[in-house]
């Protein structure tokens, strides 16, 4: 099969809402549709030319979410003939959706596809496993689905404990973690103040008692955070532990979408490519150390693409926890100045199924802002996985 070049021709993301914040009453399907519709409009591609739509999602919040990609596609203007499907690779879902869309193009299933992700953690449901057939005498239990997916399925430990494990194994100190967290907050605040995200963000219409308002600014950022303030926070998951609410990612809401097109179609339709997908890779690691997943995934993508770490001008390595973010930087020899230059999961937030598409959007935008050539997008994945992709500015 002939190798097909795949280009990014349009991106869009919503601003990221904090847990129980501005987006708490916005349906997940609306977030997804908003991002997909904007990405199509920005790409210059006609909606009826989209050959496939793939959306990442982890936490279903409504029965419609089972149809998330299909709802987003049709409500964004794609014809009913456009196929769509959801993917769930947990924290890597948004990036996996982009990879899956690219695979559809690479295999000749279509020439243009959309990959993205959408998550409303604020609307995560509680469910009762005993309700369908009747509970026995005594109390029944409601399971917090949102909190549940943040636990390892084997050890039954919170992902925060896996971060503690990584810190212990790789010699990461509390001071290093808090310093990274503060740097993330400062970078995100500076990016917002400078308006760097304005071209990325599509406003979300939010219905309030006073009418419809537009949500267009990331709201999770804590610009006034300091190392001194973080150092006083108590461990969140383990007595005498290092992981706190201040050096961990947020629980958030948001969506993003990326339009991909095959090189021949880019030329034929006169589209303006933003970046080329150079390669991608996945890896598995010990579930109890899931945060180190980006290390083998990145090493795989370096081997496949023939690139070196020093070739990357921008590195979007999602901050699930400062512990794992520090360990990944240490193990791969990243230049900290190139890593998450505009903030990441700790400061901006981590709407799990959407984050991969959000940081892809950020990485490509930063390449164009700075004139860099290559960007790495990578993230750890609950259950013990890693995913990585490389994009080249064009």
Annotate each predicted stretch with a short phrase.
Residues 7, 12-14, 24-29, 33, ...:
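N-terminal extracellular/periplasmic Venus flytrap/periplasmic-binding protein-like
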Residues 13-41, 59-62, 85-99, 122, ...:
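Active-site pocket-shaping loop/turn-to-helix segments
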Residues 112-169:
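Flexible glycine-/small-residue-enriched beta->alpha junction loops
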Residues 161-164, 197-200, 207-208, 278-347:
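Active-site pocket-lining segment
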